[in-house]
Curated annotation (Swiss-Prot):
One of its GO terms (cellular component) is cytoplasm. K(+) binds at residue 44. Binds 2 divalent ions per subunit. Binds 1 potassium ion per subunit. Catalyzes the formation of S-adenosylmethionine (AdoMet) from methionine and ATP. The overall synthetic reaction is composed of two sequential steps, AdoMet formation and the subsequent tripolyphosphate hydrolysis which occurs prior to release of AdoMet from the enzyme. PANTHER family: S-ADENOSYLMETHIONINE SYNTHETASE. The gene is metK. It catalyses: L-methionine + ATP + H2O = S-adenosyl-L-methionine + phosphate + diphosphate. PROSITE patterns: ADOMET_SYNTHASE_1, ADOMET_SYNTHASE_2. It comes from Helicobacter pylori (strain P12). Keywords: ATP-binding, Cytoplasm, Magnesium, Metal-binding, Nucleotide-binding, One-carbon metabolism, Potassium, Transferase. This is S-adenosylmethionine synthase. Mg(2+) binds at residue 18. L-methionine binds at residues 57, 100, 239, 270. It comes from the Bacteria. ATP binds at residues 16, 164-166, 230-231, 239, 245-246, 262, 266. The lineage of its organism: Bacteria, Pseudomonadati, Campylobacterota, Epsilonproteobacteria, Campylobacterales.
Length: 385
């Protein structure tokens, strides 16, 4: 008997208010880390109707021109006219950034050269064989749709689109394998002149059908494009945006647990970010090595402590090896101290703006070192001993 179910994931465009906040926070981080690799950065951003507030804590000798950084991000996204709900030229930018607490810093920067974890917490990584990038199919497709919304807007293929938007993809699984697409939801901000009929037809023809893999298509897919009938007011005019509110969009679309820590605006001494990247690196290499078809990896840390307090591997009954054996392999092959993660993944670089929209995982860019499968052979060798 077939075990059949639907699973759904969503994505948002770079013009979504929460993603605007993430991108501003990461742009601040990139500006600082490019000039001061020892900097400690925890940058939070709020965008709302006509203004942006940047806050958080820093430990750096670098002066960051917050107004210029924020305005450039908003301009690049495409909020270049007040009619879109936000304008990079006229929006107020408030700077409320303070200094990092010395109580925290004393546990992170150590005299022996090691780095203690910047906070306690648990982080998850995940990989599976549903796509070439070893990501779950629903979130993979959802990101492709939102990215295409932005590209078709920017290249004027669909000039009536505006920056804010979302996608949602429901996939049918049988015996834990994706077999078809059931439902596509796309909500996109648009100019007031375009008819909903034209918008729906254009989005489906120019974006959806050009993105979706043919093997998952059929005649009964349900399409909902702007199901409320109108989406003119968008961006920060429609909803306030905050850094760190799209943590499921940023990761695996709900396919695995989440430890709760957001990524954007945090330098790699914060294990919320760096250890989540490391957990993806571990999970992806386990699957790429062939020791399992699916892997969920949990790492946990204590503030100021060098080694992880726990490592857990769940292969969802797709491996002949036990969790105990896999944990030993992970400890042997990967460096999972904060310093080990930072060095092995080369994280002290201004790469974070690239991560802040369309997912931190499953995008095989040169800068995304945690997406490499260069540990797969070491994993194979470990189990041949």
């Amino acid at each position: 008997m077939k075990d059949s179910f639907l699973f759904t994931s969503e994505s948002v465009t770079e013009g979504h208010p929460d993603k605007m906040a993430d991108q501003i926070s990461d742009a601040v981080l990139d500006y600082i880390i490019e000039r001061d690799q020892k900097a400690k950065v925890a940058c939070e951003t709020l965008v709302s109707n006509g203004f942006c507030m940047i806050t958080g804590e820093l430990k750096t000798s670098v002066y960051a021109p917050m107004q210029e950084i924020a305005r450039e991000v908003v301009k690049k996204i495409g909020y270049t006219d007040a009619l879109y709900g936000f304008d990079y030229r006229s929006a107020a930018v408030l700077n409320g950034v303070g200094e990092q607490s010395p109580d925290i810093n004393q546990g992170v920067d150590r005299e022996d050269g090691e780095i203690g974890a910047g906070d306690q917490g648990l982080m998850f990584g995940y990989a599976c064989k549903e796509t070439e990038t070893l990501m779950p199919l629903p979130i993979h497709l959802a990101h492709q749709l939102t990215f295409a919304l932005a590209q078709k807007r920017k290249d004027n293929t669909l000039p009536f689109l505006r920056p804010d938007g979302k996608s949602q993809v429901s996939v049918r699984y049988e015996n834990n394998k994706p077999v078809s697409i059931d439902t596509i939801v796309i909500s996109t901000q648009h100019s007031p002149e375009v008819s909903q009929k034209h918008l729906k037809e254009a989005v489906i023809e120019e974006i959806v059908y050009k993105i979706l893999p043919k093997e998952y298509l059929h005649d009964n897919i349900k399409f909902f494009v702007n199901p409320t009938g109108k989406f003119v007011i968008g961006g920060p005019q429609g909803d306030a945006g905050l850094t760190g509110r799209k943590i499921i969009v940023d990761t695996y679309g709900g396919s695995c647990p989440h430890g709760g820590g957001a990524f954007s605006g945090k330098d790699p001494s914060k294990v919320d970010r760096s250890a989540a990247y490391a957990a993806r690196y571990v999970a992806k290499n386990l699957v790429a090595s062939g020791v399992c078809d699916k892997a969920t990896v949990q790492l946990a840390y204590a503030i100021g402590v060098i080694e992880p307090v726990s490592i857990y591997v769940n292969t969802h009954n797709t491996s002949k090896y036990s969790s105990t054996e896999l944990e030993k392999c992970v400890k042997s092959v990967f460096k999972l101290t904060p310093k080990g993660i930072i060095e092995s993944l080369d994280l002290l670089r201004p790469i974070y703006s690239l991560t802040s929209a369309y997912g931190h995982f499953g995008r095989e860019l040169e800068e995304f070192t945690w997406e490499k499968t260069n540990k797969a052979e070491e994993i194979k060798a470990f189990f041949k001993r």
